[in-house]
C-alpha cells in the first residue's frame, strides 16, 4: 500500500483544499493529512477554527483516509511514525522542497516530495480571500443597516 502524507492548516475549507487533497490522493492508495497545530502556524494569522475542529472537517472529506494533528514540538514526528512513500505539498505551502528532502534524508525517511500545482479557475481558493470577502460584505451590510436605522 502506497501511503501519501499531505499537510496544511486547513482553516476555512475551500475548493482549493479539496482539489489539493484529491490530487494528493491520486499519488497513492492511502492519504493521511497532518493538520497544523495552532502553535506551529507562524506564516499567517492564527487560525479562526480550533485545531481539533479543523482536523475533523478534513477527515470528513472524501479523499482523506485519516487526519491527525501535527506535533507541537517536531513537525517530523508524525511523518516518522507514518512512514509515507510520498509527501504532497500544496502550491502555496512554505516548504523549500530541497530543505524538506534533506531533513527527511537525515531522519532516514525515504519519501518522494511532490508539489501539487495550483488550479487557476477558482475565485475563492484562499482562506485569506474568503476572510477578505466576508469582511468587505459585512462592512457594506453594516453600513446599509446603519443608514436604514438612521432613517427610522
Curated annotation (Swiss-Prot):
GO terms for molecular function: ATP binding; FMN adenylyltransferase activity. Pathway: Cofactor biosynthesis; FAD biosynthesis; FAD from FMN: step 1/1. InterPro entries: Archaeal_FAD_synthase, Cyt_trans-like, FAD_synth_RibL, Rossmann-like_a/b/a_fold. Keywords: ATP-binding, FAD, Flavoprotein, FMN, Nucleotide-binding, Nucleotidyltransferase, Transferase. Its EC number is 2.7.7.2. One of its GO terms (biological process) is FMN metabolic process. NCBIfam families: cyt_tran_rel. Belongs to the archaeal FAD synthase family. This is FAD synthase. It comes from Ferroglobus placidus (strain DSM 10642 / AEDII12DO).
